[in-house]
């Protein structure tokens, strides 16, 4: 089950919190969900070059607070906060409430799964070889302190006629362990051959109660797998 399900959704209430935080009722829930989707879609498009990893939306009766977690917060804020005011005016067209926007910086962007997935897709759009792009992102994440990382890409890789899936893994990524802090990200690359999807899982350690010592396990060596049957790749 841990291999198939979204690792963030599986750990909600255990070591992850919700990205939308409000108390719904049967009348307002559909509208709130629709507005949250529109806000996220707008901000991801508008702040693409700021490296947005997460958007947290909190609601009260009359107020809406949006927290944007990004790798380059200066691009969002602008000169003397001018760009923040423009964002507020744009969001008021979507939501008829008093809006406040908070900006948080990602401490280690190389070890953030969403930013890592977007990094892979940006390289693929620049026609970088997919294996090179994956290994480069993996090395950067491990240097930034990740305990393990797994990257999977799917689509017409290297312009092949038949779509396939390939993945690389380094270190430990225990998807079945609920106390494991697993970060997950997904992005798509629009290439001339079609869309290539990239998924990234990053293991950042275990969340334990006080007084409990984690089990010591040896790290697995880096490995890769082609996702079509048992056919092996030829010499590169």
From Swiss-Prot:
Q: Does the keyword Transferase apply?
A: no
GO cellular component terms, alphabetically, are: cytosolic small ribosomal subunit
Give the keywords, sorted: Ribonucleoprotein, Ribosomal protein, RNA-binding, rRNA-binding
GO molecular function, a single term:
mRNA binding
Residues forming the KH type-2 domain are 39-107
| GO BP terms in the entry | translation
Keyword Methyltransferase on this protein?
Answer: no
According to its UniProt record, which protein family does this protein belong to? Answer: Belongs to the universal ribosomal protein uS3 family.
Please explain the role this protein plays, according to its UniProt record.
Answer: Binds the lower part of the 30S subunit head. Binds mRNA in the 70S ribosome, positioning it for translation.
Record's protein name: Small ribosomal subunit protein uS3
Organism encoding this protein: Wolinella succinogenes (strain ATCC 29543 / DSM 1740 / CCUG 13145 / JCM 31913 / LMG 7466 / NCTC 11488 / FDC 602W)
């Amino acid at each position: 089950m841990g291999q198939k399900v979204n690792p963030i959704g599986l750990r909600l209430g255990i070591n992850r919190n919700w990205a939308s935080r409000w108390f719904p009722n049967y009348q307002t829930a559909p509208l709130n969900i629709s507005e949250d989707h529109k806000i996220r879609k707008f901000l991801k498009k508008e702040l693409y070059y700021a490296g947005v990893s997460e958007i947290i939306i909190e609601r009260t009766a009359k107020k809406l607070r949006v927290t944007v977690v990004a790798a380059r917060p200066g691009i969002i804020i602008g000169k003397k906060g001018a760009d923040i005011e423009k964002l507020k005016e744009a969001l008021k067209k979507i939501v008829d409430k008093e809006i406040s926007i908070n900006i948080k910086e990602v401490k280690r962007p190389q070890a953030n799964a969403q930013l890592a997935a977007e990094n892979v897709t940006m390289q693929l759009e620049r026609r970088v070889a997919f294996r090179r792009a994956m290994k480069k992102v993996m090395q950067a994440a491990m240097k930034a302190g990740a305990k393990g990382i797994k990257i999977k890409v799917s689509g017409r890789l290297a312009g092949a006629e038949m779509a396939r899936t390939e993945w690389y893994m380094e270190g430990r990524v225990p998807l079945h362990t609920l106390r494991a802090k697993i970060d997950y990200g997904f992005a798509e690359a629009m290439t001339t051959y079609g869309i290539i999807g990239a998924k990234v899982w990053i293991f950042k350690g275990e969340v334990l109660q006080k007084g409990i010592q984690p089990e010591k396990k040896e790290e697995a060596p880096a490995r890769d797998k082609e996702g079509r049957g048992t056919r092996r790749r030829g010499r590169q």
